[in-house]
Structures are given as C-alpha cells and as structure tokens.
Amino acid sequence: MTTQVPPSALLPLNPEQLARLQAATTDLTPTQLAWVSGYFWGVLNQQPAALAATPAPAAEMPGITIISASQTGNARRVAEALRDDLLTAKLNVKLVNAGDYKFKQIASEKLLIVVTSTQGEGEPPEEAVALHKFLFSKKAPKLENTAFAVFSLGDSSYEFFCQSGKDFDSKLAELGGERLLDRVDADVEYQTAASEWRARVVDALKSRAPVAAPSQSVATGAVNEIHTSPYSKDSPLVASLSVNQKITGRNSEKDVRHIEIDLGDSGLRYQPGDALGVWYQNDPALVKELVELLWLKGDEPVTVEGKTLPLNEALQWHFELTVNTANIVENYATLTRSETLLPLVGDKAKLQHYAATTPIVDMVRFSPAQLDAEALINLLRPLTPRLYSIASSQAEVENEVHVTVGVVRYDVEGRARAGGASSFLADRVEEEGEVRVFIEHNDNFRLPANPETPVIMIGPGTGIAPFRAFMQQRAADEAPGKNWLFFGNPHFTEDFLYQVEWQRYVKEGVLTRIDLAWSRDQKEKVYVQDKLREQGAELWRWINDGAHIYVCGDANRMAKDVEQALLEVIAEFGGMDTEAADEFLSELRVERRYQRDVY
C-alpha cells in the first residue's frame, strides 16, 4: 500500500511527528489502518464539549506539566504512572518528553514536575540535554511563579548518583521556583519510592490545583497511545537464540558476539534505533561459589516479592551478582565488622573505588564472614535487564532481532570473572535456548523522515550496532540520501566488525563513505574523533547540506571526545567562536539532527 505524502507546508505535523506516524503505521494491514483511523476519530470526538472553541472557565486554572527525561524507559514509566494518577484525581495535566518540550515556555509554567534519570558521568538523558543547557545558560528565565517537584532515578553504583535530578532541582530553585516537595533520589529498585512519591505529589497538587471537569482532563491531559504488543519489561517475550557468532579475530583482545534471536510469531515490532532488553540468569557456578563462601547450602528458604524460593534459585534469577556498589560494600562491612572493609566506611570515594574493582564474590572471599540467607538477600540489589542497541531492521530480517554484544571478561587474582548478561548470551544459552526479551523504544535515535537526508554515523566498537540497522533500513527503502560511517577499534585484522557487510554496502553504493580508525595498528593511536577532524571540511559540507549526525557507544570518554571534535570542526569551518559553535550544535540537537545513543 502506497500513501502519497502531501507537501510539508500543508501538513499540521512537524517532520519528527510525521516520521513517528509513518514509522508506527508502516507495517499495518489495510484492516489495521482502518481501525487506527477510527481510533483517532474516536479520540477526537469522545468529548466534543470539552474541545469546543470557547473553553470552560476551569480551563484557565493552572495546568500541571510533567516533563519526562528518560534514558532507558524507567523515568518515562514513572512519569506515565503519575500522569494517570493525576487524571484519576481529575486534575488538568499534560505529559511531554523532554526532547519535545519547548523549553522557552518554562517561564509560563505554574506547576511543573520533572522525572529524570542520569547517564554517563552525571549527565542528563540525551532527550534532556538541550533543556538542561538552556536552564544553566544566561537565557534561563526567572521562575518566581513556578512550583515544582523532581523525582530522580539513578544507580548508586555510579559516582554521580542521580546527578541530573540534583541539577534540575537546584537550578529550578535558584531561578526562583518553589519546591512542592523535596527531591527524591531513587536507586535501581525505584518502584516503592516512586509509588510513595506519586501519592505525595497528588496530595500536594490537589491542594493547589482546582479539580478539572473530567472532559478537560481527557482532552488536555491524556497522552493517547496504541499498544500493539503484549510484551514489556515486566512481561517479556520468551524467544529463542538462533545464532551466536564471534565476530572478532582469534587474536583480538575483545570477544564480540553477533547474536540473533528468533521472535517467532510473537508480532513483536521494533524500529532502527530501538534497544533490546534482555533478562538474564546468573551463572550457576558463580551462585555456588558465593553460597559456599558464606557457609550456606543453597536450599535455605528466602522470600522474594512475596514468594518463598530456595536461596540458589533466588540468586540465579532475581539478584544482581556481577555489579558491586558502594552501598553493598558499606553494608557488608557493617554487618560483618570486617577489619579490612570497616576503614572504608564513610569514605565515599574509597567505597566506590573498591566496589568498581572488586566483584561481590571476591569481596566475600577477601573478607570472609558468615551471613544467613535472608541477610544475604537483603544485602543484594534486584537483578535488572540489560539493554543492547538493536543491530537489525525488520525490513530485512523480519521476525528476528540482532544485537552486537561485547562480552565482559576479566581476572581477579587469577579467577575468571564475566559480565552477567554478556556471558549469559555468549556462554550459557545454547542454540534454540530460551531468552526473555522486550523492546525498549527510543524515539530519540531515529533515521530522518526524509529519505533524501544525508546521514553521518559515528560508532566505534560495539557502537556500530544501530548503524547496521540503519543501513539495512536505508537499503530496503532505497533511500537516495548519502550515508557516511566513522568506525574505530584496536586492529583492522582482528576487530573490523561486520567488515564484509560494510564492504558490500560500499560496493553497492549504499554507503557513500567510510572512515576507519585503528588505534593500535601504528605507533600513534588514532581514534574516530581524529578522523572527524581530518575530514572537517567535507564534514561541514555535509552538515550544511542538512545531514543528521548520530553517535553511539561509550558515554564517558568517546562521546565527549567526539562532541569536542564536532565543535572544533563547526568552529573552524563555520567561522564561529567557541560559544557560537556550542549554540550551533545545541540547535542541531533541538532539531533532532544530532542524536546520541550512549551508555
């Protein structure tokens, strides 16, 4: 079925909204399209009185704006739950993604709620970077008439725990805003804290905002969504692993796997740019080692989410064993009165360093103690799924999903250790074995709506994964836009991931340019950011031609170095000073011409 798209000037949608609409409907049957058409007609007409040209007096009450700033989807889920709570309380509320928020309107907000996660070294999620920059710039307005609350999600195993939320909270207050509630900083197991916070927010807002008519709550507050899949983070699909192929050479220092998962007839859909969530199981050998070190048997009964399970099963399926945290080290030291660990208590930097260099099982080995099963369970954090950038397009692979997995392997005093999810996929799931998966949609990492738009892809290491999906999609669409890939890794002969595929794309004319950086093949190390500077003049020409820039990979070093190189290219070839170049790149981000998927 072919749909003729009218000229953009005649459309009430902006290009990004149009792209989302096209992506959401591209694989629907005529019957499904007819149903969707009726669905939206019903949404428009379900409350005609509330949508009349003359608003009811209650429409002039202060509305509540919730800004969701999410990296992995958790903040978005909390924000959606709060929106639903407020609608149930008949309050006038709207929910907006940080990337879609017109941040200059913040001065007119009366009641503002921010739900945000943190990425990298205390940075805001990608979709909130522009808003964060604006608030911390000289352009930020005074907010004396704004009351606000912030819920911050983070991971206490990282040094800059919940830093993004702390930033938003302090800056909103500095600009004159009034706190409705004190900020809440939630760890990985955030659900209970979020539930309690939502109830407090509803109570606080009930006393401030007049109750809206039900029709107005629906018309202005609801974000209508079509859920086409029954599978989610909490209800994953049980799929099967069909391919597990090592794609680095035998002499490579890296073990990178190409993993293919068969989705069967589940109907699970995804787009290039999305991530695959994988629920993994801990290595039974690791469980056995930990249990024996604590002089336990493994059959002791423990309670997990209201259910009684044997300790071994609980540890294998429900608790994080491969990532240590400062809190775990501190609590273990306090519980066991370890002479080695007690001196670290109270020193956050030392606790974090110890946690980063010493896995939980080795902490117990180095500082032995005897804990009962319940004490062990209470010490640990719940197991959470790992997210992998999807390396395929369903336009080519149909009912499969591919990911590129860098297997984490290292030694601690001669004992082999491995990452939980990566070693699960690489070592412990046999062919046709079960894998529990779900799709984490990422609307902040999408191909341009216009197939003629040039694309610049920067993805060293496993950061190349989404660009394989991009190229599969562009090839399937026969998109005429130019494509330029920057890729880097240590060695050409050992670490050129998907080499044959990239060479084929070049030969077929789908991949216009490819620049490669091999950091260990010569005396002087060369990285992708060096290639960006080297090709600065041509890069600037592409940007002037409307190219979209995509970056995927390590957030802590690579992404920052790449951004610095881009700023230098913009300044040099665009004839700008540092401040103007930064403003230019920020505008590209706002226009969704500069998108990052970093971790």
From Swiss-Prot:
Textual note on the cofactor: Binds 1 FAD per subunit.
GO biological process terms held by the UniProt record: cysteine biosynthetic process; hydrogen sulfide biosynthetic process; sulfate assimilation
Entry keyword set: Amino-acid biosynthesis, Cysteine biosynthesis, Electron transport, FAD, Flavoprotein, FMN, NADP, Oxidoreductase, Transport
Residues involved in NADP(+) binding: 519-520, 525-529, 561
Positions of FAD binding: 322, 356, 386-389, 404-406, 410, 419-422, 599
Stretches assigned to the Flavodoxin-like domain: 64-202
One MF term in the entry's GO annotations: sulfite reductase (NADPH) activity
GO cellular component: cytosol
Cofactor or coenzyme needed: FAD; FMN
Pfam family, any one: Flavodoxin_1
Record-listed E.C. numbers: 1.8.1.2
Recorded superkingdom: Bacteria
Pathway entry: Sulfur metabolism; hydrogen sulfide biosynthesis; hydrogen sulfide from sulfite (NADPH route): step 1/1
Matching NCBIfam families: cysJ, PRK06214.1, PRK10953.1
Subunit record text: Alpha(8)-beta(8). The alpha component is a flavoprotein, the beta component is a hemoprotein.
Protein name per UniProt: Sulfite reductase [NADPH] flavoprotein alpha-component
Organism, scientific name: Escherichia coli O9:H4 (strain HS)
Record lineage: Bacteria, Pseudomonadati, Pseudomonadota, Gammaproteobacteria, Enterobacterales
Name of the gene this protein is made from: cysJ
